[in-house]
C-alpha cells in the first residue's frame, strides 16, 4: 500500500522530490558536472571529446533536431540550471521559457540569463508543466521524463500535446 501511495507524482510531491535532489549545495554539482552544469547524457563524437565538448555537441544536436526558426516560442520542461534554454536563445532568434521545480536552479538560471544579457529572450519560472496553459512551437525536455513516473506518462504526453502548436515539434529525451 505504501509503495502505491508514494508512487503518485502529484504536483506538491514532485516539487518535494526535486527539492530533495537539486536544492542542495551547488558545490556538490560543481565537482562532477561540466562548467554549464548539464546533468544529462552527453554526445561524444569521438574518444578525444572532453565532457564539456560532448555536452556542447549534445546541445547542437538537439537544436538541429528541433528545426528551430526565427521568432518561435520554445518550452524547456525541466530546464535545470538553464543551459539548454540559454544556448537555444543565444544561437537562435527564438523566445524560450524554461520551467523547473527547483528554487536553486531557478535562481541560477535567472542569474545566468542576466549575465549573458538574454533576459529579453529567455524566461525561467518555478512552475510544473501541468499548470501551463500556453502554446509553443517547440517543446524540449532532456533528462526530466524519468521523474514523471509511469502512472503519469499519459498526463505528461497529453499535456505536451496540449501545449504544442499544431505543426510543432517536441523532443523528449
Residue ranges and their predicted role:
Residues 81-92:
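Conserved SAM-binding loop of SAM-dependent methyltransferases across substrates and taxa
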Residues 167-173:
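Conserved beta-strand signature within the Rossmann-like core of class I S-adenosyl-L-methionine
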Residues 140-145:
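A conserved beta-strand element that flanks and buttresses the S-adenosyl-L-methionine
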Residues 1-31:
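N-terminal auxiliary segments of SAM/dcSAM-dependent transferases
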Residues 71-78:
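Conserved class I S-adenosyl-L-methionine
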Residues 109-110:
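Conserved SAM-binding loop
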Residues 154-167:
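A short glycine-rich, Lys/Arg-flanked "PGG" loop and its adjoining helix->strand segment in the class I
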Residues 130-139:
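A short acidic, Gly/Pro-enriched loop at the edge of an enzyme's catalytic core
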Amino acid at each position: 500500500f505504501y509503495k502505491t501511495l508514494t508512487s503518485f507524482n502529484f504536483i506538491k510531491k514532485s516539487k518535494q522530490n526535486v527539492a530533495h535532489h537539486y536544492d542542495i549545495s551547488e558545490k556538490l554539482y560543481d565537482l562532477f558536472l561540466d562548467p554549464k552544469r548539464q546533468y544529462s547524457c552527453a554526445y561524444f563524437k569521438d574518444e578525444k571529446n572532453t565532457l564539456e565538448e560532448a555536452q556542447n555537441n549534445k546541445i547542437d544536436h538537439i537544436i538541429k533536431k528541433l528545426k528551430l526558426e526565427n521568432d518561435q516560442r520554445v518550452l524547456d520542461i525541466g530546464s535545470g540550471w538553464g543551459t539548454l534554454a540559454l544556448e537555444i536563445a543565444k544561437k537562435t532568434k527564438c523566445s524560450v521559457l524554461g520551467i523547473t521545480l527547483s528554487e536553486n536552479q531557478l535562481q541560477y538560471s535567472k542569474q545566468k540569463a542576466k549575465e549573458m544579457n538574454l533576459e529579453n529572450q529567455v524566461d525561467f519560472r518555478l512552475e510544473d508543466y501541468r499548470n501551463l496553459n500556453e502554446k509553443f512551437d517547440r517543446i524540449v525536455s532532456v533528462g526530466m521524463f524519468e521523474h514523471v513516473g509511469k502512472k503519469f506518462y499519459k498526463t505528461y504526453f497529453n499535456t505536451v500535446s496540449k501545449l504544442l502548436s499544431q505543426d510543432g515539434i517536441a523532443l523528449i529525451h
